[in-house]
């Protein structure tokens, strides 16, 4: 299977897993055009997986269903997803094109957000980003931290497939919080070179994220110290460390909003 991120909008990725015969699993098609263009080159849509209800992740589905009316769509139970689809949730599993994916509920960015895990791949929508995490639009910091901790416990070789290309803007904040992290410094340099070459910085290994993403390192002494300095007091617990980081990032001069 070939894993390919298709750019959409300014910074979205539509993820595709393509079999040798062209049949493909499509994750979060916010636009139809990238899929239609890929179809002209041999891609055959076989199933759509949706992580959450936001338009930049599901907006292309109606047009794709007009073209392929029997195309199965799998998405969370959410009345805001106005589609004919298979409702799935925590504990479900999907078997598509010989691949098995576990479905886990990762609330925080939205109440019903799902993540798909399988074949050493993690399709996490707007829960986990390269060097960052999604904003908390509907959930709580406690929920979002718990969701991220579930993802952090996966095998370190897992490849993280995020919904947006935010690595460089996230790196600016991460280095502000954790400036002496040499692995983070190296990642920023590598990401900058990749973007200058027109390449995606994703997927990225979970191991790399665990070493460099401040939102996955809330128990690390350096991150705890940085948030204490920012708050001008000692954080109460790890949830407050996380909530402080998220609020800090929301107001950081260089940012992207999913």
Swiss-Prot record:
Details of cofactor binding: Binds 2 Zn(2+) ions per subunit.
Molecular functions (GO terms): hydroxyacylglutathione hydrolase activity; metal ion binding
KW Nucleotide-binding (keyword) present: no
The entry's keywords: Hydrolase, Metal-binding, Zinc
InterPro entries, per the entry: Clx_II_MBL, Glyoxalase_II_hydrolase, HAGH_C, Hydroxyacylglutathione_Hdrlase, Metallo-B-lactamas, RibonucZ/Hydroxyglut_hydro
Pathway in which this enzyme or protein is active: Secondary metabolite metabolism; methylglyoxal degradation; (R)-lactate from methylglyoxal: step 2/2
Role, per record: Thiolesterase that catalyzes the hydrolysis of S-D-lactoyl-glutathione to form glutathione and D-lactic acid.
Taxonomy of the source species: Bacteria, Pseudomonadati, Pseudomonadota, Gammaproteobacteria, Lysobacterales
EC numbers, comma separated: 3.1.2.6
Residue numbers binding Zn(2+) 1: 52, 54, 109, 126
Cofactors named for this entry: Zn(2+)
Protein name: Hydroxyacylglutathione hydrolase
Assembly and interaction partners: Monomer.
Family: Belongs to the metallo-beta-lactamase superfamily. Glyoxalase II family.
Pfam families: HAGH_C, Lactamase_B
Catalysis performed (reactions): an S-(2-hydroxyacyl)glutathione + H2O = a 2-hydroxy carboxylate + glutathione + H(+)
Residues spanning the membrane: none
Residues at which Zn(2+) 2 binds: 56-57, 126, 164
Enzyme class: hydrolase
Gene: gloB
SUPFAM superfamilies on file: Metallo-hydrolase/oxidoreductase
Alphabetical list of NCBIfam families matching this protein: GSH_gloB
Alphabetical GO biological process terms: methylglyoxal catabolic process to D-lactate via S-lactoyl-glutathione
